[in-house]
Amino acid sequence: MIGKIEIDEGKRGRIIDKAGHLADEVGAKYMSCAPATFGAICDAFRSEDIELFPPEIQEAITQGMIGLHGGVAMTGVGTCGAVAASTFLISYVVGVTTEELSKDDNLNYAASVPAVEYIIDRFEEDYGAIDCLRVRYNRVQRAFDLMDPDARILEMTFALYEKDKCGMNAPNFEGGRDQTPPVRGARWAAEAICDLLGMEPEERHELPPHLRGLGSQDMEPKLQKVVEALKELGWGRPNEKISYREYRTFKLKGKKGLEQKRLGSVSAPKGKE
């Protein structure tokens, strides 16, 4: 766990700007949002003598971050790599240990609240999404499944043809590069981390009043009577295990309908031998 570190306004501003510039430079070098965002944030703090990870640990984590690029494994369907990397670092600085979490699972909120406040809400406001495909489409009206080689070619063509719109390595930092998800994610995460480092470690674990008492350890004894009443009513069909594909059949035809063979399960007729 990282202890409290006083960061004055000058140093804070330099860290945030450095994180943004590095995210652009490294993002263009790697063409990979998650490792670029992660590395930019770590190196920005190191430039002001604040080490989040030793270099060898940072390198090891960066290798893992590569798989989170492009909406997880370059498919586009998962979370934006810049969001994932930023959230990872914020959670790390909040510093909830596994031992603490095993005693109070409500501490999941401690790592989540600042990530939502500084990263998720801002991505939703600026890009209308946090998943890779929609972030890219809403930003530049282009989005591809990068596992498709043709789509990869189209993406690179767009990046070279529309440099200012793409943003990577655009001449004007504020007008161009500052638009990109790695840059904004790195800047916003750096801002969050500066604020978190200004707190004592215990303060980072404090929750807003409306999220307190929601851990399973607190709720289970209070909810046990409710659970027993629901079981008596048969609510939720606790003994039924059906897939979402079977749910409509269940509603229309009941359990008997599920037990009947579907058309697709009938064996194909054998051909003449």
Place the predicted regions along the sequence by residue.
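Acidic-glycine-rich active-site phosphate/pyrophosphate-binding loop
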Residues: 2-13, 41-67
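Long, low-complexity, intrinsically disordered segments
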Residues: 253-273
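Phosphate-handling active-site elements
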Residues: 44-62, 92-115
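Amphipathic alpha-helical interface segments
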Residues: 34-44, 86-90, 104-234, 245-250
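Conserved phosphate/anionic-ligand binding catalytic regions in large, soluble enzymes, centered on
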Residues: 72-88, 228
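Short alpha-helical scaffolding segments that buttress acidic/His motifs in well-ordered protein cores
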Residues: 19, 23, 37, 61-69, ...
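Polybasic, low-complexity association/targeting segments
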Residues: 2-33
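A short glycine/serine-rich beta->alpha loop
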Residues: 19-28, 68-78, 106, 172-179
